Amino acid sequence: MKLLRYGPSGQEKPGILDADGRIRDLSAHVPDLAGDVLSDAALARLRAIDPATLPLVSGEPRIGACVGRVGKFIGIGLNYADHAAEAGMPVPKEPVVFGKWTSSICGPNDGIDIPKGSVKTDWEVELGVVIGTTCKDVDEARALDYVAGYCVVNDVSEREWQIERGGQWDKGKGFDTFGPIGPWLVTRDEVPDPQRVDLWLEIDGHRYQNGNTRTMVFTVAQLVAYLSTCMTLQPGDVITTGTPPGVGMGIKPSPVFLKAGQTVRLGIDGLGEQLQSTRNAQ
């Protein structure tokens, strides 16, 4: 299934794409795509519904983040060896974990606010993993059983705040609008191997990132298992799993960063696309 949330910010309703790619309303069946609605049992109940029997959503509504009430938004750094190289950092022996504030979450097409004074706002297309079942100390072999599905994430990053100003990466990762998620939550049965998906990103039509999750340092299963040893993962938690090479700070001889008035387009095969305009934060 391709699940989504549509409507004004803060008033999103749950929906599903039908066979023709049209949005059907799910709000008579579930209040939101959040919490226990993401469990295997609840998703099985949604799967049993014929989308053609659901109300058709008219027009072109705003698409919100594909998960509601996210409890934890967990980032993984340097998870592609070639990205670590372009960043001038060693390939990690254990996952690099940081937090993205949930206040950074926005819809896939809502736009990116460049922070006041920023000249180093950067892009990162990433595979997002949405937890569906509470898990703690799970084995790698069973880790994917706890995943509800997958989505596109743009891990927007302000490199000066992330790298140059001391402290933790979190500072440069959590600005408002730095966490576009969606458009769809694609259930895990439709992504048989999360280590075999292509991901890409363009700025103003120029392709900067082309990658495949097969080159991850740590697989999705390894990340879920690892994280579950140091925290309890809960339904609706989102893990954004790292980016392939081609980010702005890695461009030689001179880095390239986002400016107001640009268009960012990114996507992952089978998971949909995002389209964002950049603007200066007010």
From Swiss-Prot:
GO biological process, one term: urate catabolic process
GO MF terms held by the record: hydrolase activity; metal ion binding; ureidoglycolate lyase activity
Enzyme class: hydrolase
Recorded superkingdom: Bacteria
UniProt entry tagged with the keyword Hydrolase: yes
Keywords in alphabetical order: Hydrolase, Magnesium, Metal-binding
EC number: 3.-.-.-
UniProt xrefs under Gene3D superfamilies: Fumarylacetoacetase-like, C-terminal domain
Positions of Mg(2+) binding: E124, E126, D155
Needed cofactors: Mg(2+)
Family to which the UniProt record says this protein belongs: Belongs to the FAH family.
Annotated protein name in UniProt: Putative hydrolase BamMC406_5393
Natural source organism: Burkholderia ambifaria (strain MC40-6)
